[in-house]
Amino acid sequence: MNTRMMFARAVAGAAMVLLTNCAWGASSADWFPVSVGLTMARPIPPFPCDNVAGLSLCLLSGEDCPVYGLQASCLSGCAESIYGVQIGAGYQCADDVYGLQIGGANVTTNLRGVQVGGLNAMRGYGLQVGAWNIVDETSFAVQIGVMNSHFWKMDASQSSARSLQVGIANRADGGSRLQIGGFNLSDDGSCFQIGLLNFHNGWITPLLGWSSK
């Protein structure tokens, strides 16, 4: 799946979730269509910071609860899960993100979608666009940025991860990957590199590098 299609599907999915769940949330006793607060601990009546199906708006920081729709914050947003869009000027975090995450720094332990920001860190499947992109464990990722990192805590030879990295500096350990950039580093696993200098399994080569290990 190419980058444009992945991004388009994430945005379309976020919009669909936002539209369909607003009406559902309004009619549910356990969910609220709108949530407004200064922080997660200081909601503004009559808009509780609780389970949200629609719009979650916090002036300082978002609340730690599930959000189906849009969560927007001036500084930072935190949520148990996001099904839609999470956006803010500062730090954005969520356990699960199914959709789009936009912020100065974005962190999630389970991504199915897109991250756009200065710093992006995730586990899961998706696209990262930012200055520094970080992926952990057996993720399937497309990383576009100044610096891209793909790390493994497990035995790299047993990793099933796949990644495409496009940036000035790219690093990946284990799995299989395609690296395109100025400087590419690959410690283990199979790789194909296109760049000014390519470091792979103890070798240093200009322009092209590859390994089937």
Segments from the language model and where they lie:
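Bacterial N-terminal signal peptides
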Residues: 10-21
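Low-complexity intrinsically disordered segments
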Residues: 2-3, 17, 160
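Bacterial N-terminal signal peptides that target proteins for export
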Residues: 2-12
